[in-house]
Regions:
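Sequence/structural segment immediately N-terminal to covalent heme-attachment motifs in c-type
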Residues: 25-49, 54
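Residue-level signal for beta-strand positions within conserved beta-sheet cores that form or flank
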Residues: 20, 50, 101-103
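Conserved Rossmann-like nucleotide-binding pocket used by diverse enzymes
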Residues: 17, 33, 106
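C-terminal capping alpha-helices of c-type cytochrome domains
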Residues: 83-128
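Electron-transfer interface patches adjacent to heme c in soluble/periplasmic c-type cytochromes
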Residues: 43-45, 56, 60-87, 107-117
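C-terminal segment of classical bacterial N-terminal signal peptides
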Residues: 7-8, 14-22
């Protein structure tokens, strides 16, 4: 009986965690989180700063924004099939230099999952 309950609980947790960020997060709070990003990134297509523009980032192959010089590591990740979606972006933003060793991004990462959820909600809205 205990094993059945434990297995059921594990399955439920996995199901909830696999839902993703599509409907989670607060756009207004995500905009505040984006303040940490906007020193290096814009939301305007083709307008890059230290980092690439995030306009149209979801569904884009890593290292492929036009007119931006990406690190070899980011280009290699893209060539290996990395495409930005809510899950890959969230994993990257937790620990960028661990997720893609050799990335030029110096940001240490967001530590709180709620910050990432809110940022994903904002970016999905702002980069349509």
């Amino acid at each position: 009986m205990k094993k059945t309950l434990s297995l059921t609980a594990t399955i439920a947790i996995l199901a909830v965690s696999s839902i993703g960020y599509a409907n989670a997060g607060d756009v207004a709070k995500g905009k505040k989180v984006f303040n940490k990003c906007k020193a290096c990134h814009t939301l305007i297509a083709g307008k890059h700063r230290i980092g690439p523009s995030l306009a149209g980032v979801f569904g884009r192959t890593a290292g492929s924004a036009k007119k931006y010089k990406f690190s070899k590591a980011m280009k290699k990740a893209g060539a290996g099939g990395l495409v930005w979606d809510e899950k890959t972006m969230a994993a990257y933003l937790m620990k960028p230099r661990k997720y893609i060793k050799g990335t030029k991004m110096t940001f240490a990462g967001l530590k709180k999952p709620v910050q990432i959820e809110n940022l994903m909600a904002f970016l999905k809205e702002a980069t349509k």
